[in-house]
Amino acid sequence: MKKLLLALFTLAATIGSASAQVEIGLKVSPSITSLRAESTSKNSFASDGSQFGFSGGLVVDYFFGENYAFSTGLELAGKGGSIRYTDYLNSGVGNGNPFPVSMKISTQYLQIPLTVKLFTNEIAPATRLYFQVGGSLNVPIGTRINGNKFYNDPVTGTENKAGDYIYFFDADALVAAGAEYTLGKSTKLFAGLGYHRGLVDIDHYFESKRGFSDVTIKNSSFGLDLGIKF
């Protein structure tokens, strides 16, 4: 019995020590998002404008040193933008009459950051800077094109779900920097700037369904990170 109590006490002490190294909080990030689009000159895919996005969710910082932390969490992130391209009345093979097409794509992602945060020593009372680098894994959960859940291809006349245009997975490179201010024993406020650069071609329609050549569409977003940790 004594050994069991000692083991439980040791386990509780270990958990308490470990929990002191973990900071959990909430974050919101208003952002400007866009799509980087390109293709061969026949279809001339290009970005056609940015849009306002918003993300927010849970932040978890696990410290493995006084100034170093593995940072992850779970966020809901809005991304997208407008793209333009040239289509043809004979289903895009390039011999018919060309005409321009523009479409606005908005996608909601579940996003899991996988990053390292580096903190400076205090640069002012209760204030230190942080630098964050890594990436994120993203799964789309909803897409709209021109504000609608369905989209009619202007050449084929086929109606598809907007989500059919988007690949089922995305991954970003992520860099961020900001400042963190300690309010009390464990409460901290932070603010910073972050840039997500998509690494995965999210086109799931133009090459596979329309036979376009070398189409690439990738996400980008630049945002303001605001949050609190407890």
Which positions does each model-derived feature cover?
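Predominantly the C-terminal beta-signal and adjacent terminal strand-loop region
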Residues: D170-V175, A179-F230
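Residues on the lipid-exposed face of transmembrane beta-strands in outer-membrane beta-barrel proteins
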Residues: L26-P30, F54-Y62, E66, L74-L76, ...
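Extracellular/periplasm-exposed beta-strand and loop segments of Gram-negative cell-envelope proteins
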Residues: S34-Q51, K79-L110, V139-D170, D201-G223
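Hydrophobic, well-structured mid-protein blocks that either form specific transmembrane helices
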Residues: G94-G135
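Short glycine/proline- and aromatic-enriched beta-strand/turn motifs that initiate or cap beta-hairpins
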Residues: A20-V59, K229
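Short loop/turn motifs that connect adjacent beta-strands in outer-membrane beta-barrel proteins
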Residues: S19-Q21, E66-N67, N121-R128, L183-K188
